C-alpha cells in the first residue's frame, strides 16, 4: 500500500489493479436484498442502486471494460447499459463478495468521514449535472452524469487505500487558504489525481 509521498504513480496503478475496491454498506445491503429475488430483478433495478455509489459504478465499468470484445466498438456510457451487457445473473455472480468501505475504514473514522464527504459531493454533482443536461436537452445525459459522479474517484481511492496521505492533503488545504486541491495533491502525492485517473483508469 502506498503510504508515503515517495510512492511512484506506477505503485498506485499496481495496487488498484490488484485490489478489490470497496463499496458503501448501503449498496451491498441493497444488492444482497435484490439477489434474494433474482428472477424478478431487472437491469434498471440494479442500476438504480449502483448509480448512487461512485465506487460501485467504477467497479461495474471496470468489469465491462474487461469483458468487452475488441471487436465491439460500441461504447457503453450508462450504468444500466453496463448491467444489460453483463446480464443480471452474471452481475450477481461477479459481485457476490463485495468488500464494504465502512468495514475497511472502521479503525480510521476520520478517513471514513473523508470518503463519505467526497461521495456525497460526487452524488450531488452528478444530480446537478443530470438536471442541467436534461434542461439543455443534451443527448448524452447519462454520460455527463456518470462523468460527474466519477470525477473525484481518485480522491475516494486515496481515502480508502492511503488514508494517512489523504489526511495530509486535507491538513495542507486547511493550513493554506486559497490553495487548490491539485497543488496539495502534487505536494503530498507528487502527482495530481487527474494524472492518476488518466494512467490507472485508461
Task: Map each language-model feature to its residues.
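Conserved alpha-helical "signature site"
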Residues: 1-170, 174-202
Amino acid at each position: 500500500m502506498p503510504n508515503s509521498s515517495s510512492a511512484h504513480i506506477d505503485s498506485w496503478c499496481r495496487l488498484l489493479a490488484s485490489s478489490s475496491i470497496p463499496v458503501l454498506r448501503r449498496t451491498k445491503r441493497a444488492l444482497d436484498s435484490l439477489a434474494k429475488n433474482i428472477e424478478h430483478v431487472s437491469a434498471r433495478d440494479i442500476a438504480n442502486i449502483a448509480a448512487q455509489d461512485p465506487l460501485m459504478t467504477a467497479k461495474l465499468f471496470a468489469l465491462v471494460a474487461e469483458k468487452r470484445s475488441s471487436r465491439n466498438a460500441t461504447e457503453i456510457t450508462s450504468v444500466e447499459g453496463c448491467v444489460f451487457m453483463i446480464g443480471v445473473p452474471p452481475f450477481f455472480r461477479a459481485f457476490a463478495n463485495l468488500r464494504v468501505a465502512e468495514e475497511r475504514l472502521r479503525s480510521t473514522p476520520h478517513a471514513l468521514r473523508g470518503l463519505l464527504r467526497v461521495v456525497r459531493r460526487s452524488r450531488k454533482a452528478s444530480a446537478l449535472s443530470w438536471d442541467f443536461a436534461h434542461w439543455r436537452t443534451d443527448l448524452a445525459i447519462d454520460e455527463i452524469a456518470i462523468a460527474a459522479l466519477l470525477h473525484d474517484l481518485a480522491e475516494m481511492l486515496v481515502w480508502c487505500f492511503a488514508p494517512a496521505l489523504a489526511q495530509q492533503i486535507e491538513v495542507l488545504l486547511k493550513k493554506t487558504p486559497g490553495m487548490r486541491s491539485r497543488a496539495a495533491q502534487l505536494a503530498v502525492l507528487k502527482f495530481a489525481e487527474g494524472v492518476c485517473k488518466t494512467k490507472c483508469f485508461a
